[in-house]
């Protein structure tokens, strides 16, 4: 996309970090799933600053040092005589230079340095600790393998634990930004077009860019593009997760496929997989951040009445339609794959619509908590409850694709059931009920 969208909060935070680094060394970590827009954010941020952008290629240490040495000389005037062959010596020279000169240094795909030289992070820790007191460097690192970046900086056994002075986790674009982008490319878009865009991208910058730049700005064109022979949407789910999970992805993928089909309780998943999947579910949640447990609002955190949810809209789509129909892709039956998607589209996008409105409400209102609710028997279920504990307000929503299917009187009955169970939690709160449909997007 030619235009740079949103990221106002992140850019504001980065500008404050820049001011801080004029007086003391700053070490900022940018995380976020692949394709989220980390590199674009940083390139936009440094374009008018004295800066150097270093990309970690999977080459030998000596070759990488040669590439970086040239970039440092060209971009910030750090001229080092002789040929450098070790990352530790190069970083030492960078830290020494930063004692006299202020600059921004961005290292992309930072986690790959561990593969190139397993001892480098320990060496970097020592050099940082020894030189940061006199340095004025604004060091920013980012990486696309989320689980590795998290381990490098958040595992107390790792050498760089506690060294970051700031962390920014990049999240998908909000519903309002998705609307802005689609409106720029297709001013006459329908809400069905917007829902399809959200189903396929979930606000992830790269996926939106692929669709918009290919002219896929309507539901029909998006589905056509996604199921085309050259479509990156057919392979990206596998590519993104294998980089995180490595060779042990088989069971994880089977679990994600089941969750995408609506089997969201562990006992349901266990019965199909034929083994206890508890450890796998914990890893998918805590290590890979691909799923999360959803519990009824006001239930205890240890409540077993939990449902697992894929947190990423594209991955939910990928496992429901692409991974589960991989044979159609391998046989080149793209038209048949398209027919399968269109056949189940309305049912599948019901949950997408709920997620869209959850994010939209959270974006537009001041809330202390938001979520759904259901009783143990599953007989009473409320799509969205948005609470402001400070103002003692509680807004309850029923979500349907079609407005004429919303039944507020039935929703009121569910609210009464909800109130009788949570009791004191919302005693004295002003409660309102609403219905939202495609028309309200």
What do these predicted ranges mean?
Residues 1-339:
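Phosphate-binding site recognition
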